[in-house]
Curated annotation (Swiss-Prot):
Residues at the site labelled Lowers pKa of active site Cys: K163
Gene name of this polypeptide: lipM
Name of this chain's protein: Octanoyltransferase LipM
Active site residues of this protein: C148 (acyl-thioester intermediate)
Other comment: In the reaction, the free carboxyl group of octanoic acid is attached via an amide linkage to the epsilon-amino group of a specific lysine residue of lipoyl domains of lipoate-dependent enzymes. The reaction proceeds via an octanoyl-thioester enzyme intermediate.
Function according to Swiss-Prot or TrEMBL: Catalyzes the transfer of endogenously produced octanoic acid from octanoyl-acyl-carrier-protein onto the lipoyl domain of GcvH, an intermediate carrier during protein lipoylation.
UniProt GO MF annotations: lipoyl(octanoyl) transferase activity
Amino acid sequence: METWRFIDSGDRDPAYNMALDEALLNWHSEGLIPPTIRFYGWNPPTLSIGYFQKVQKEINMEMVEKHQLGFVRRPTGGRGVLHDKELTYSVIVTEEHPDMPASVTEAYRIISQGILEGFRDLGLDAYFAVPKTEEEKNALKNPRSAVCFDAPSWYELVVEGRKVAGSAQTRQKGVILQHGSIVLDIDEDKLFDLFNYPSERVRERMQRNFKNKAVPINELRDVPLSMEEVKKAFKDGFEKGLSIKLEPYTLTDAEEAEVKQIAKERYETDEWNFRK
C-alpha cells in the first residue's frame, strides 16, 4: 500500500492557507515530497474567491469588512466560498500517478472518493451528483451565481439531493491540486451578505433556493459533530477511498519560511486579490 503524507496545519490565516497549498504543489512537482493530503481551518473566517472572479462586479467588500472576514483569491477556479465552520482539505498528487486519470472530471471523482468514504463513515448516505440532462450540463458551464454552494457541479457530493462538499481543482507543473470544503454549520445570512445582486428580490430568491440545494453536515444529524470527529472520519475516508496509508508530517522551519514568503509575495497583496 502506498504511503502519502498527511498534514494537519490547524486554523491559519487566508494568505498562509493558499501559500501552503501552492508550496506543496511546487515541492511535489520537484520530487521533494510524496503525494500529500492536508487538513486546515481559517482564522479569521474568510471569503475565498475563484481565480477568475471579478471582485468589483461580484463581491460586496463592505460586508466582508463589516463581518470582519479575511479575503483571498484562490489559485483554483470556482466561485465564492465562506470558510467558517468547516474542515478544508487539499490533495496534492502528480498527474503521472498511475491512479490519476487524465481527464479533470475523472481525477476529481477518484480524489473525491476519499470524501465520499468520509461521509459514509459519519453515517451519511452521500453520492456523486452527475448531471444527466443537457440543461444540467449547461447550468455547469454558465453558473448563475457567484456563490459556490449554489449548485452541484460534476461529481460534487450530495446527501438527500443537497450539496454537502464543494471542491475546486487546478493543474500546474504536472501536479493536481484539489481543495475543498466540508461544511459543519453555515450562517446563510452572512454568506449572502457577501455578494452583489441586481436587486434585493434576486437575493431573497437565491437565498430561499439555497436551502434546497446545499446543506451543512450538522443539519443532517441529530447530534452535532465535533471538528475532531470530522477530521478522523475524513482521514480514514481518504485512506480507504484512495487505498493509501497517511503518515503525519510537520513542516520544517525552512519549509515554513518558504510558505510565508509565498504568502507575502502573492496572497497578501492587493495585486493578486483584487486583480482585474
